[in-house]
């Protein structure tokens, strides 16, 4: 506090004390004594103590200088006048003012949270009732909706469950009857592919060592040799049949395996052609007609 009085008193006393601490301490107490005390203190601390004492009060206190200071304590004397407390207005208006003229215990403070705050256009029903959520979006005839009848029941081939896609005659559908039942050799389950007479039956293709090209001359060399053997067998069989009973010539042996399916088909066709050509009616057991086969 300011302790007006303080002055003189204390003097003598305080002395030394304050010092130690130097600074006003001692005073600590009285500090107040407004008087010079404390102040100066820091400085000369107590020093002067004893001395000057009184001075302290001298208020002016040279204290500044140190001396006296301590004394300053003036022991408190400087008392805090109750009147000072009486001067402070404890009315709510003084200490509970929120700066807006409203007191903390004033109902006006809560009136600021007016219902209008939660009743503005931000929560207007129109916000969620606009055209973005229009039924026409989900029920239109465009093909850009995932559940549009026009998409699933149309005749386009771009729908995975379109009847026109699965039942068409194109060969681009994995379950198309035309693909699985055709006569092409490009289907894995085609009867013509698996049940043909290409040269891998009866051991013709790889029996008797014919299937392995020990001479390492390549697939075509092997194929030529296999066809030549088949042609020779066909001619021999036809000749024997013609001499004995003039019956039809035996069918030519199948071409050896190897080479493409198409090459095998050609080889088979030529072998049969050779067999048919070499057969003939024997005349009195005469030799049947012979026809040389040109190698592939």
Swiss-Prot record:
Stretches with biased composition (Gly residues): 1-77, 198-210, 244-259
Compartments, as annotated in UniProt: Secreted
Tissue and organ expression note: Component of the acid-soluble and acid-insoluble organic matrix of calcified shell layers (at protein level).
Extent of Acidic residues compositional bias: 80-96, 103-194
Disulfide links within the chain: none
Highest taxon, organism lineage: Eukaryota
Region (Disordered), start-end ranges: 1-219, 233-296
Record key words, sorted: Secreted
GO CC annotation terms, alphabetical: extracellular region
Predominant localisation class: secreted
Protein name, UniProt field: Aspartate and glycine-rich protein
The organism of origin for this protein: Haliotis asinina
